[in-house]
C-alpha cells in the first residue's frame, strides 16, 4: 500500500517491519532487534542500520554463570536476566528518517499494524503450528497467557482470532510520539518494571539511553 501512496521502498520496509509483532509474534517483535541495509537511489549510498539489542548497564561478565563458574543455559536463555534493551522501534524509526519519502509519517506506516492488533488476525499457519510448542512457557506469564491461550489454558486453535489490544496501545504510542513513545514514558516504565519483577536488570534508563 505504501508505494501506491507515493512512498519509497524504505517506507514499505518500515510498514512491513511493523506487522510481524502482530502477525508473526514468535519471530518478529518490538521487543527484539535486527539489522537493515538500505540503498539510497538518489545518492547511490548504501546505509546499514544496526539495531540489535544491547546489554543493560548493570550486566556483568559473570551474570550467566552458576555457583561453580560454569555457563548456566537457563540464565542466558530462559530468564529475565537474558532480556536485552530492544532496538526494533529505534531501528525502524531511523530507517524511516533515512529512507522515507517524506510523504508518509511514521504513524501512517504503523497504523495498519495497529488495526491488525486491535481487530485481530486469524490463527493460521505458523502461529497455529508453534503455539502448542510454546504453551507451557506462555502460561508462565500473566500478561501473555490471556492473549495466546483460552480461558481453560488451551492454545488458540486455527480459525480463532488473535487479539492484542495492549500491543495496539503500545503501537499507538509509537505512532503518536515516535521512538520516545516506547523508550520513555508509560510504556518504558511498564516494560522495565515487568523485567525487574521477573528477575531481570533492565531499567528505564537503559531504555531511554538506547542508541
Locations of the language-model features?
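Noncatalytic scaffold domains of N-terminal-nucleophile
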Residues: 5, 9-184, 188-211
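Conserved short S/T/G-enriched processing/targeting/catalytic segments and their helical context
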Residues: 1
Amino acid at each position: 500500500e505504501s508505494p501506491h501512496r507515493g512512498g519509497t521502498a524504505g517506507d514499505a520496509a518500515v510498514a512491513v517491519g511493523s506487522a510481524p509483532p502482530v502477525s508473526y509474534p514468535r519471530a518478529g517483535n518490538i521487543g527484539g532487534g535486527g539489522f537493515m541495509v538500505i540503498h539510497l537511489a538518489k545518492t547511490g549510498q548504501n546505509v546499514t542500520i544496526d539495531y540489535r539489542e544491547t546489554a543493560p548497564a548493570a550486566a556483568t561478565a559473570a551474570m550467566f554463570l552458576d555457583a561453580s563458574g560454569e555457563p548456566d543455559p537457563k540464565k542466558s536463555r530462559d530468564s529475565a536476566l537474558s532480556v536485552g534493551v530492544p532496538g526494533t522501534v529505534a531501528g525502524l524509526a531511523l530507517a524511516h528518517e533515512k529512507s522515507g519519502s517524506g510523504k508518509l509519517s511514521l504513524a501512517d506506516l504503523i497504523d495498519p499494524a495497529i488495526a491488525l492488533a486491535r481487530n485481530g488476525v486469524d490463527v493460521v499457519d505458523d502461529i497455529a503450528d508453534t503455539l502448542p510448542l510454546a504453551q507451557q512457557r506462555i502460561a508462565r506469564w500473566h500478561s501473555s497467557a490471556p492473549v495466546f491461550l483460552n480461558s481453560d489454558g488451551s492454545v488458540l486453535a486455527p480459525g480463532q482470532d488473535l487479539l492484542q489490544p495492549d500491543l495496539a496501545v503500545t503501537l499507538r504510542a509509537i505512532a503518536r510520539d515516535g521512538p520516545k513513545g516506547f523508550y520513555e514514558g508509560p510504556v518504558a516504565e511498564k516494560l522495565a518494571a515487568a523485567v525487574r519483577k521477573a528477575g531481570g536488570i533492565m531499567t528505564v534508563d537503559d531504555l531511554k539511553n538506547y542508541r
